[in-house]
UniProtKB/Swiss-Prot annotation:
InterPro entries: AB_hydrolase_1, AB_hydrolase_fold, HAT_MetX-like. The lineage of its organism: Archaea, Methanobacteriati, Methanobacteriota, Stenosarchaea group, Halobacteria. Disulfide bonds: none annotated. One of its GO terms (molecular function) is homoserine O-acetyltransferase activity. It is found in: Cytoplasm. It comes from the Archaea. Keywords: Acyltransferase, Amino-acid biosynthesis, Cytoplasm, Methionine biosynthesis, Transferase. It is an enzyme of class 2 (transferase). Homodimer. This is Homoserine O-acetyltransferase. Residues 47-369 form the AB hydrolase-1 domain. Residues 387-415 are annotated as: Disordered.
């Protein structure tokens, strides 16, 4: 159902669009792919900005004033960045965010109704980042949006943004990739694999067939997967600052997961309480099968797939690019962004790699808007010449050999 809200300084569209038959990269065809989106501001024909959400995010990127968003995400996930007078100023830009296929916030996915009237479950076609991009392109066609002023993405949304430069290079003027990379490294692939195993090992997963009011859902497995995710998103320093070794009162949450026999003797620590809380909240709002599908899509993405190199994949893109990385992010490191910047430079794409000093880990792109907003907003407005945009390459070419980043811990378990 389409909804349009207009308040002073705000115009918000929220809708689910049936874009018709859609062939996935796997070759499987969905007869009626439904795509959910939200859009903010007024479209003037040349001011459209597409924001690509993170792994378990949704189309609810900005606040509505009333803050009534999609299920379980009443709070906008980037509300400090998108909105009137903010970095992505909806007084100037028509900002669109699309829930990707395979997710569970209105776009078709495993929890959606299939042709037989039952949820698809694991019969839903496998999805890739390329599928996300093509679905977004079709949704934008439906909205009458052609060339995009900018595509912006954070985390796996940054991979989605990069894919726009490969699949639709003529449709993007400016590309902003925040806390992302050209591909996952083997450590992150391994952690994602364990997270999926946690879900599929839960007896309630039942091969992906757990839908229905009278069915138990694999909340324990999904919760464990989310806990692994949160350990990836935080840095050693931020965890030490937030939790240290402090004990917490067990209350109800201390019994959220089965305890080992000696648990009563040892303290229930604040870090455990935090992880248990995040697990409980996540299981209330997200679908376990969607988590399996979306992590597979992220793991599978490789910018250079089908090309000789990352640079070759980006060669057709003639716009400008901003890469934002964070010194405390070991999920997507500054080194990975610098490598990506080098790929852009090798094909003469104007690029700036803006490094943010932060110890907040991967979450920095969400929790430090005061550091992300200025370079992002200036880039979208003015390109790489934007006032707040900095670059690791001191002369606009190859990076200075003396350039040194703050240390990034490569392993969660060695810190």
């Amino acid at each position: 159902m389409s909804r349009t809200r207009t308040t002073p300084g705000r115009r918000v569209e929220s809708d689910v669009v049936d874009i018709g038959e859609h062939e996935f990269e796997s070759g499987e065809i969905l007869p009626d792919l439904k795509v959910a989106y939200e859009a903010y501001g007024e479209f003037d024909g040349q001011n459209a900005v597409l924001v690509c959400h993170g792994l378990t995010g949704s189309q609810h990127v900005a606040g509505h004033g009333t803050e009534s968003g999609v299920s379980g995400q009443a709070r906008a996930w980037w509300g400090d960045i998108v909105g009137p007078g903010k970095a992505l100023d909806t007084n100037d830009y028509y900002v669109i965010c699309v829930n990707v296929p395979g997710s569970c916030y209105g776009t078709s996915g495993p929890a959606s109704e299939g042709p037989d009237g039952e949820p698809w479950g694991t019969d839903f076609p496998p999805v890739t980042v390329h599928d996300w991009t093509r679905a977004q392109r079709r949704l934008l066609d439906h909205l009458g949006v052609g060339r995009l002023h900018a595509v912006v993405g954070g985390s796996v949304g940054g991979m989605n943004a990069l894919d726009w430069a490969v699949q639709f290079p003529d449709d993007v003027e400016r590309l902003a990739v925040v806390a992302s990379a050209a591909r996952l490294d083997s450590q992150c692939l391994g952690i994602d694999a364990v997270a999926r195993r946690a879900i599929t090992s839960d007896p309630n997963w039942n091969g992906g067939d757990y839908y229905g009011e009278d069915r138990a859902t694999p909340d324990a497995g999904l919760g464990l997967a989310r806990q692994l995710g949160h350990l990836m998103y935080l840095s050693k320093d931020s965890m030490e600052r937030k939790f240290g070794r402090r004990s917490a009162g067990r209350g109800d949450r201390g019994d959220a997961f089965p305890s080992d026999p000696a648990a009563a003797f040892f303290p229930y620590r604040e870090v455990e309480s935090y992880l248990d809380y995040q697990a409980e909240k996540f299981a209330e709002r997200f679908d376990a099968n969607s988590y399996l599908y979306l992590t597979r899509a992220m793991d599978d993405f490789d910018l250079s797939e089908g090309y000789e190199s990352d640079a070759a994949a980006l060669a057709a893109f003639e716009g400008e690019s901003l890469l934002v990385s964070f010194t405390g992010d070991w999920h997507f490191t500054t080194e990975q962004s610098e490598s990506l910047a080098g790929a852009f430079r090798r094909v003469d794409v104007p690029v700036a790699h803006h490094v943010v000093e932060s110890d907040h880990g991967h979450d920095a792109f969400l929790v430090e808007p005061e550091k992300v907003g200025p370079p992002l907003g200036d880039f979208v407005d003015e390109g790489v010449a934007g006032r707040a945009v900095t670059d690791t390459a001191t002369d606009g070419g190859e990076p200075d050999e003396e350039e040194d980043f703050a240390p990034v811990h490569s392993s969660l378990f060695s810190r």
